[in-house]
Amino acid sequence: KAAGLREFQVELGHADFYRGLAEEAGMDEETQEQLRDLIENKNYFGVDELLSSRNLPEETKQGFLKLLEMFGSAGQIAQAKELTANPRALKAIARLERIQELLEDYGLADYISYDLGMVSRYQYYTGIIFKGYTYGTGDYIVTGGRYDRLLEQFGKNSPAVGFAIEVDRVLTALLRQRIDVPFTQVSALILFDPAAEKQAIRLGRHFRGLSL
């Protein structure tokens, strides 16, 4: 909103929901990686083919196929409970439910949708993951999530949340949506004779102190 966009959606998922389902299915790491890539790309036939080749129970296979279709309103959260009894996955669902409550209290729920099949190729995500979308771009304009153990690699044990804004895509969206962004900038150019160099430097420092 601060950038000027009026119509946008932030899509929420949880990294541990997929991990819980994979854990419940007893998948090896290689299969989990392959399946993650297929789900990320919403490749229904690829998921079907991969799981069929692993001789998994039909119920398990159908559960992962349903995962590809579980995106949209907050009602997807309740449906997700029917897919699993895994504690890790259910804890992820409970977290999403709590976040939905908070978003409603803050009056932000209309900007939010859910994708239970949202996965990330980045293994350091440990909780909520999200992507933001708007009209006029072919991809997300912001992406991020929670990573509780990433900072351990840099010597600090601390939970964290981070995100990245795709500035070029935001600007493209603003242009295509014909949104004018207020822009105020005062520029100053100081011309001086060599004899006035010191005074010009002082004046330049003064202007920079005023963020000009």
Question: Language-model segments: which ranges?
Answer:
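Short Asp/Glu-rich motifs
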Residues: 19, 41, 170
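Short, surface-exposed recognition loops or helix-turn segments adjacent to catalytic cores
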Residues: 7-17, 35-38, 113-117
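Positively charged, Gly/Ser-enriched RNA/tRNA-binding surfaces
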Residues: 1-6, 49-212
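Beta-rich nucleic-acid/ligand-interaction surfaces
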Residues: 12-24, 118-126
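Short, amphipathic alpha-helical segments
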Residues: 12, 29, 41, 58, ...
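Class II aminoacyl-tRNA synthetase-like tRNA-binding/catalytic domains
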Residues: 1, 7-11, 19-23, 28-33
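Acidic, His- and aromatic-enriched active-site or binding-groove loops in soluble protein domains
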Residues: 26-49, 56, 108, 134
